[in-house]
């Protein structure tokens, strides 16, 4: 039975309008984005099958286009709708960390970085630029791809810091594997960046590694002195 044949008020869109999005399951929310299913599967059933196929919403949103679009009932249009929803969530998170906001709450920073980086299927190295009062200047994604000590260039970081007149920075990157534990390469990158920034009297406050549901802070581990 298609969703249009369900009793009035029972479809996911009706439920969202009547009760709010928080009352919908993951499959129902996804069905609202998908809008329709295919022969033999309504939108909710299709949503459930996609979540099951990829092992969760995060994996679905991180999956490359070719992996998503090869499945019955999902083409470029539906893939674009899902990616647009994911990007909107990132931009809402970015608005929560506005220019000029003072970073006095570590949980706010963690939540922001989680929303920015957890749903990427590739590695991203980014920098949060702060002024002398630790107010936000800008969040910038610097490098994408395989992040190792050879692919992160301290001179580019220093150049950006000078351009934006930052007094302190927090660097971060994600592990698409979902495991946030830093590697030895991560520690080498951090040391090189700390030394490079010290030459221009800019403090490296932290390096945060973002996993699936956790963030590892170098500062909390005592790895940044």
From Swiss-Prot:
One of its GO terms (biological process) is proteolysis. Transmembrane segments: none annotated. Residues 102-224 form the MPN domain. Zn(2+) binds at residues 173, 175, 186. Signal peptide: none annotated. A motif (JAMM motif) lies at residues 173-186. Belongs to the UPF0758 family. This is UPF0758 protein Sputw3181_0338.
């Amino acid at each position: 039975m298609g969703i249009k044949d369900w009793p009035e008020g029972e479809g996911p869109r009706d439920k969202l309008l009547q009760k709010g999005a928080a009352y919908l399951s993951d499959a129902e929310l996804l069905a609202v984005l998908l809008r329709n299913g295919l022969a033999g599967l309504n939108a909710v059933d299709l949503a459930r099958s996609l979540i099951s196929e990829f092992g969760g919403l995060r994996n679905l949103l991180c999956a490359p286009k070719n992996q998503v679009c090869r499945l019955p009932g999902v083409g470029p249009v539906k893939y674009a709708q899902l990616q647009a929803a994911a990007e909107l969530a990132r931009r809402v998170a970015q608005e929560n960390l506005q220019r000029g906001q003072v970073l006095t709450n570590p949980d706010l920073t963690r939540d922001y970085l989680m929303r920015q980086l957890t749903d990427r299927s590739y590695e991203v190295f980014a920098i949060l630029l702060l002024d002398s009062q630790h107010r936000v200047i800008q969040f910038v994604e610097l490098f994408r791809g395989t992040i190792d000590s050879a692919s992160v260039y301290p001179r580019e970081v220093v150049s950006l810091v000078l351009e934006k007149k930052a007094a302190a920075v927090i660097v971060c990157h994600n592990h698409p594997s979902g495991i946030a534990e830093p590697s030895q390469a991560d520690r080498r990158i951090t040391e090189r960046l700390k030394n490079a920034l010290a030459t221009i009297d800019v403090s490296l406050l932290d390096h945060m590694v973002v996993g699936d549901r956790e963030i590892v802070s170098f500062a909390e581990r005592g790895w940044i002195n």
